Amino acid sequence: MKKNSFISVISDEKKEENKGSVEFQVFCFTNKIRRLTLHLELHKKDYSSQRGLRKTLGKRQRLLAYLLKINGVRYKELISKLNIRELKTR
């Protein structure tokens, strides 16, 4: 999980890192989710990490819903780059 290569992909119009962008925040949450998932495969009874994983999943879901509402094209690009599933719509 290389953070710097993805930062350059996200901020191709800007030369500086745009850490406040929705895409970067979703990217950081995705990395955290993957790390926690690997941790929980080894430590199945770590309930505090399970709670942290659920909270992080909820935060990422809210950010993705916001991005979908604001700009659907950027949402589609992001989920394809990060290789994550689309949101379930009600």
Curated annotation (Swiss-Prot):
It is found in: Plastid, Chloroplast. SUPFAM superfamilies: S15/NS1 RNA-binding domain (SSF47060). InterPro entries: Ribosomal_uS15 (IPR000589), Ribosomal_uS15_bac-type (IPR005290), uS15_NS1_RNA-bd_sf (IPR009068). Keywords: Chloroplast, Plastid, Ribonucleoprotein, Ribosomal protein. The keyword Ribonucleoprotein applies. One of its GO terms (biological process) is translation. The keyword Chloroplast applies. Gene3D superfamilies: S15/NS1, RNA-binding. GO terms for cellular component: chloroplast; ribonucleoprotein complex; ribosome. Disulfide bonds: none annotated. One of its GO terms (molecular function) is structural constituent of ribosome. Its main location: plastid. NCBIfam families: S15_bact. HAMAP family: Ribosomal_uS15_B (MF_01343_B). Component of the chloroplast ribosome (chloro-ribosome), a dedicated translation machinery responsible for the synthesis of chloroplast genome-encoded proteins, including proteins of the transcription and translation machinery and components of the photosynthetic apparatus. Component of the chloroplast small ribosomal subunit (SSU). Mature 70S chloroplast ribosomes of higher plants consist of a small (30S) and a large (50S) subunit. The 30S small subunit contains 1 molecule of ribosomal RNA (16S rRNA) and 24 different proteins. The 50S large subunit contains 3 rRNA molecules (23S, 5S and 4.5S rRNA) and 33 different proteins. Belongs to the universal ribosomal protein uS15 family. This is Small ribosomal subunit protein uS15c. The gene is rps15.
